[in-house]
């Protein structure tokens, strides 16, 4: 049995477009993971069954598009629900309930947020907060289990900001007039931390490979984000960035490999 790393499979689809051997950095950013592989690719590798010798370096982590959406929801949407406020006595409200509310890829965090004990805590928080109306909206998220809808709204905002400088996001499922504007600058600030972790994986793959890529092949659901392309271009200036079928490249690559293995 041969197991293929997903960026290697994704890269095989891109390899079919090459007319000469190149060092290709494949960056595959999925929903929950980022995988990076530095590979030798080209016509001379097309019909090789064993690709181990073409793999120069690899790295990966459990950060992906979902983490970008969660970060945007936390930084840009949670303040609408009272995050960063104070009690009537001037004591800062704890941040954790707002984080747990949108940490949809963290089972313990979601279990804690939707626990009965946390419901009582949020009720007390509404009573004690200076801006009780805003904190009551977080309590509504708890009561109606709205976490996924909040993060989905953040994802839609991230997508909208791919081709415009500013986007107004509304959350009518929480409150009719609840809305805010998110700018490109706000998006960059919100996504800085998970984006940095993705760039660290790129650097790890390059450190493992000990060579500079000729081209970057960016794929996966988050590959369409101009912010990610910009960050990669800044990290690796002068290296062209190519793209393909962001959602189907792994499948297409595996199909090509199957033709080699079973022809």
Q: Locations of the language-model features?
A:
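Glycine-rich phosphate-binding loops at beta-strand->alpha-helix junctions
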Residues: 142, 146-147, 213-232
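Phosphate/ATP-binding catalytic cores across multiple sugar-kinase/actin-like superfamilies
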Residues: 7-18, 153, 157-160, 189-214, ...
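Adenine-nucleotide phosphate-binding core of ATP-dependent small-molecule kinases
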Residues: 139-147, 176-206
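Phosphate-binding glycine-rich/basic clefts of nucleotide- and phosphate-handling proteins
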Residues: 40-173
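Alpha-helix capping and helix-loop boundary segments enriched in small/acidic/polar residues
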Residues: 21-27, 56-64, 178, 182, ...
């Amino acid at each position: 049995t041969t197991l293929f790393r997903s960026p290697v499979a994704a890269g095989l689809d891109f390899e079919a477009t090459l007319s000469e051997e190149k060092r290709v950095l494949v960056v595959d950013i999925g929903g929950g993971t980022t995988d990076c592989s530095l590979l030798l690719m080209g016509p001379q590798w097309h019909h090789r069954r064993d690709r181990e010798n073409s793999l120069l370096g690899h790295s990966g982590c459990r950060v992906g598009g979902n983490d970008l959406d969660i970060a945007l929801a936390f930084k840009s949407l949670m303040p609408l629900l009272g995050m960063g406020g104070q009690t009537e006595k001037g004591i800062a409200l704890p941040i954790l309930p707002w984080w747990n509310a949108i940490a949809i890829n963290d089972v313990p965090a979601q279990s804690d947020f939707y626990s009965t004990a946390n419901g009582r805590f949020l009720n007390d928080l509404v009573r004690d907060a200076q801006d009780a109306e805003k904190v009551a909206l977080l309590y509504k998220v708890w009561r109606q289990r709205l976490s996924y809808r909040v993060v989905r709204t953040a994802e839609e905002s991230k997508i909208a900001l791919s081709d415009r400088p500013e986007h107004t996001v509304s959350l009518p499922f929480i409150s009719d007039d609840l809305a805010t504007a998110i700018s490109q600058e706000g998006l960059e600030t919100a996504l800085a931390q998970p984006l940095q972790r993705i760039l660290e994986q790129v650097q790890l793959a390059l450190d493992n490979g000990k060579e500079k890529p000729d081209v970057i092949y960016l794929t996966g659901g988050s590959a369409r984000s101009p912010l990610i392309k910009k960050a990669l271009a800044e990290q690796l200036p002068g290296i062209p960035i190519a793209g393909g079928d962001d959602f189907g490249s792994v499948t297409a690559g595996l199909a090509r490999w199957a033709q080699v293995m079973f022809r």
